[in-house]
Amino acid sequence: MTKKIDLDHIAINIKDKMDEACEQFTKLGFTLSPRGFHSLGSINHSMVFNNDYLELIGFPKGGTINRPELVNADNGINGLVFKSSNIYKTFFNLKKEKIHFEKPRSFNRPVKIRNIEKKAEFRTVSINQDIIKAGRVYFCEHLTPNLVWMTNLKKHENTSYGIEKIIMIDDNPDLTAKNILKINKYIHVQKTEDCLNLQFNNTNLSIFKIEKFKLNYKSLIINMNLKNF
């Protein structure tokens, strides 16, 4: 790998509460894509921006799905997904760096455009959870990006146009940052008094210990009534 990596999207695990999640994100002013049905059995909605997107991912109520990474995970943000222009090249690079990962897999979902059904196609390679304990990390290659980043879906009532910053809470920010650097050594890391900032090409990841997060985002915790904090 010869350059810093780009964030592709953030996956938000909804499990079987997709209708409720759609209602909440619509109230927040996002434009949601029509419901997608993956060939892997999962369902999704996307909120696409200029270069990245948020993805609500889950499974149908009462249905069965062979995706333990969704079924066994908590609700909420649990996927940090980077772009890949060639998933097999990414696979080779990860292998060279001796990073534990799963074999690439391919899947698709139908997309209707002017009553014509097409297929949005993807290839992914997932990294074992020893990189980030808080959730999944994987790479995604879009074989049909035009069926994801559609112009009519980029306009949001709340004027969002990209993911500016990601905040992560971690018991050991130094170790997590070190693990992420195994994926790509060109990521710039800046250590501050409060957190570690990792700069990707198109966004920034800030890793806080819980105590520092409370100090920096006290008003957010109060306003959102985050009792667990």
List each language-model region with its residue ranges:
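Short, low-complexity cationic-aromatic patches
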Residues: 12, 18, 70-74, 129-132, ...
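Short N-terminal helix-initiation segments at or just after the protein's N-terminus
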Residues: 16-30, 64-68, 81-83, 101-114, ...
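Amphipathic alpha-helical segments
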Residues: 17-32, 90-97, 172-185, 229
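N-terminal beta-strand motif that seeds the catalytic metal site of vicinal oxygen chelate
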Residues: 1-19, 77-82, 139-178, 220
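Active-site-adjacent scaffolding segments
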Residues: 53, 57-106
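Vicinal oxygen chelate
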Residues: 46, 55, 92-162, 188-229
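Glycine/small-residue-rich interface belts in oligomeric ring/scaffold proteins
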Residues: 20-75
